[in-house]
């Protein structure tokens, strides 16, 4: 019991130190006076998540440059250097509830009725092309959406270790390859 309490205090102390990187004295005071459970949850967040929480997912302009730079520094690329992998594997990842589950938030899947939390991705590759810039942008948003959209609810698939760089490249291929069923078949529910 005593050892567990000491461990919890040590973790809270380290988290508090990390949070101080972003938070001012007033914010830290509010966290510490919000109650034990609140402080434990809040202080156990990663510093970037804590920053989003403090600012209710709307970062002030003066924090954006550093935040975006830090988020972009987290992006890792496939060992092959190729940002488009196998679209068939990408389709299996995109449409799998236990993998990326992209269709739950985005409309455009030819396999499942899509959600509307995120933007429609219907015929994504046909509308945007497959240029290197489009491949890079698509890969980076999937890897770490916060590098472009700070504090968005979209999973940060690579940054959070949910998908490997190679799996993300497969999803990019699924979205962009003109031969992919994502671009050749109608989306479920399309008119």
Feature annotation, model-predicted:
Residues 131, 135-143, 165, 169-172:
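An amphipathic alpha-helix signature
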Residues 95-98, 143, 147, 173-180:
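Sec-exported extracytoplasmic/periplasmic mature domains
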Residues 102-104, 156, 182-188:
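Surface-exposed patches in mature extracellular/periplasmic domains of secreted proteins
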Residues 1-4:
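Positively charged n-region of N-terminal signal peptides that target proteins for export
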Residues 88-91, 95, 103-139, 153:
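Gly/Gly-Pro-rich "capping" loops immediately C-terminal to redox-active cysteine motifs
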Residues 117, 150, 167:
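Residues that flank catalytic or metal-binding motifs in active/ligand-binding sites
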Residues 11-87, 141, 175-191:
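Post-cleavage N-terminal segment of exported redox proteins
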Residues 160:
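Mobile, glycine-rich extracellular loop/lid and propeptide segments
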């Amino acid at each position: 019991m005593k050892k567990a309490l000491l461990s919890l205090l040590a973790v809270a102390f380290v988290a508090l130190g990390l949070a101080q990187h972003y938070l001012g004295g007033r914010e830290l005071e509010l966290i510490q006076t919000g109650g034990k459970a609140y402080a434990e949850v809040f202080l156990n967040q990663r510093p970037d998540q804590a920053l989003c929480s403090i600012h209710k997912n709307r970062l002030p302009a003066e924090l954006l440059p550093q935040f975006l730079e830090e988020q972009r520094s987290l992006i890792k690329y496939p060992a092959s250097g190729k940002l488009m992998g196998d679209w068939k594997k990408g389709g299996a990842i995109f449409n799998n509830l236990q993998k990326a589950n992209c269709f739950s938030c985005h409309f455009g899947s030819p396999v499942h009725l899509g959600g509307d939390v995120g933007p429609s991705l219907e015929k994504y590759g046909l509308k945007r092309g497959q240029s290197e810039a489009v491949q890079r942008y698509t890969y980076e948003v999937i890897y770490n959406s916060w590098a472009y959209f700070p504090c968005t609810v979209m999973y940060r698939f690579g940054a959070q270790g949910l998908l490997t760089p190679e799996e993300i490249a497969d999803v990019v291929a699924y979205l962009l390859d003109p031969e992919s069923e994502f671009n050749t078949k109608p989306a479920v529910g399309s008119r």
